[in-house]
């Protein structure tokens, strides 16, 4: 049966329509004609993939195809890893504690948003933490482990990522592009009126940045300033000649949503003029689907090694049990990403997983 779906995205400066997406369903498999648009196959993902893990991050090992999962622990007190070679097995996998918060000083509270990266033949975990004496003095820190298995060996503390302005900062993510490694993070600026903006700089080591710092985005759009003025939780996906950066905005309740930045892959990423920003969120709450406050995502690929997946957290109810931070039920979920004829990701926010 031929299905024609017209998907209009009021983004890319609010001036374009992504166009018609054509797909054929045959024996339950989704295919595409003439390579007009990239479609994901119908995947048997058992959502949620992990319960009570906000800020989910997945690293897929290229040699084995197995998944390493990490996310924010509900008590904000430790960092855990779990691994499985099937996405649906992550919820059953043993969760191994590989690091615990300090009992005094820094790295002693609000252990948030750990990300697992592998480069320089070393595993790195980037995370945010507050001090025991001042839990809201949030800064960014790095752990390292040279063991082939990140669940084994010793995780060493490399220290804090220092930024030119010493202020509330979190959600560090790193990526390499054209021989350069970059860091994107969220940070507060006392001279501004927002809670956090997204900044970027080149890195000269796994724990330090160099050169100028550029502001990729500040929370200025209406959807980004609901409850709090926030841009945070960046994730990078390089596809189809573009560098895409998703991010999250607003308060961490049902108003939380995802936006999109992009730049041409051949452009100078440190030039702000080369970056573009969606005018509307690309993924947001949908009460009819029972999805509330989706965001702080990462990307991986399905077990076929080809299909891009969006990994994100959300709640399945509106009324919180306490505050957005004390309510533990932000569950990790996965869904395929579609690609339009212009090489942009289509998230189908109005459709379920």
Predicted regions and their residues:
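Bacterial N-terminal signal peptides
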Residues: 18-28
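Carbohydrate-active catalytic/glycan-binding domains of CAZyme proteins
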Residues: 34-353
């Amino acid at each position: 049966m031929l299905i024609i779906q017209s998907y209009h995205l009021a983004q890319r400066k609010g001036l374009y329509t992504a166009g018609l997406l054509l797909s054929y369903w045959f024996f339950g498999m989704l295919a595409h004609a003439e390579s007009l648009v990239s479609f994901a196959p119908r995947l048997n993902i058992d959502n949620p993939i992990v319960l009570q893990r906000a800020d989910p991050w997945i690293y897929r090992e290229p040699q084995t195809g197995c998944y390493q999962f990490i996310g924010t622990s509900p008590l904000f007190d430790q960092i855990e890893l779990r691994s499985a070679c099937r996405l649906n097995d992550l919820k059953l996998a043993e969760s191994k504690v590989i690091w615990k918060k300090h009992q005094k000083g820094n790295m002693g509270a609000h252990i948030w948003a750990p990300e697992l990266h592998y480069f320089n033949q070393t595993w790195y975990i980037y995370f945010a933490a507050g001090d025991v004496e001042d839990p809201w003095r949030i800064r960014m820190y790095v752990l390292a482990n040279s063991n082939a298995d990140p669940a084994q060996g010793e995780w060493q503390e490399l220290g804090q990522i220092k930024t030119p302005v010493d202020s509330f900062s979190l959600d560090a993510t790193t990526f390499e592009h054209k021989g350069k490694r970059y860091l994107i993070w969220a940070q507060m600026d006392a001279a501004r009126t927002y809670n956090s903006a997204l900044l970027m700089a080149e890195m000269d080591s796994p724990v330090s940045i160099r050169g100028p710092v550029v502001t990729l985005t500040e929370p200025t759009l209406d959807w980004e300033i609901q409850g709090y003025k926030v841009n945070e939780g960046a994730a990078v996906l390089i596809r189809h000649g573009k560098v895409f950066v998703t991010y999250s905005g607003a308060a961490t309740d049902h108003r939380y949503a995802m936006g999109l930045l992009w730049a041409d892959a051949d452009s100078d990423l440190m030039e702000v003029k080369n970056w573009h920003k969606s005018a509307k969120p690309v993924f947001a709450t949908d009460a009819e689907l029972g999805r509330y406050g989706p965001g702080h995502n990462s990307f991986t690929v399905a077990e076929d090694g080809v299909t891009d997946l969006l990994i994100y957290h959300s709640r399945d109810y509106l009324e919180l049990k306490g505050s957005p931070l004390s309510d533990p039920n932000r569950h990790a979920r996965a869904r395929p990403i579609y690609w339009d004829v212009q090489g942009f990701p289509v998230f189908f926010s109005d459709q379920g997983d």
